[in-house]
Amino acid sequence: MSKYFNKHYWIRKLFVNNFFSKFVNQKLLNKIVFNSIYKSNHWNKSKKFDQSQSYSGPGSAANSIQTNNLINELEKFFKENRIKNILDAPCGDCAWIKRIFENNIEYTGIDIVKDLINKNKEIFKSNKNVNFYCKDLVEYNKFDNFDFILMRDFFIHLPLPL
């Protein structure tokens, strides 16, 4: 089906429009846009989800060279610096970082998309070191509780100009 008949396409277009965004609370705007991106599986061009892809976009694919290199470096850094608890914000669908969960690290993921957080809670419910919360990172203020804060894809989602 053409993207022009996709309701999520129009929701994003409407709310990202600079004119309209002046009249909408920024917190509500972020929620609407990112929920729409998740529900439409916007980042996954094939529109089919499998374990090698991610609802969070192509940069979050679990088996890419870029992702494997990053995970290897993070594991090394965590070990060398005795990192015991991390905050991942926004966490997305955790497709790329779940290997970290095997390293006895307390992991907290936050994301603005409630359905995504609920799905993560279901998928990782057997892992007692993993917690997820639906929070808007722009308003989150409990950073002192973590040894390391990962904000891999946060800055590219900020509206410009800041």
Regions found by a protein language model. Give the residues of each.
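Conserved N-terminal segment of class I S-adenosyl-L-methionine
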Residues: 2-138
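Short conserved loop adjoining the S-adenosyl-L-methionine
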Residues: 139-144
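A conserved beta-strand element that flanks and buttresses the S-adenosyl-L-methionine
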Residues: 150
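Hydrophobic adenine-recognition pocket in adenosine-nucleotide-binding enzymes
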Residues: 154
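A short, conserved alpha-helix within the catalytic core of class I
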Residues: 157-162
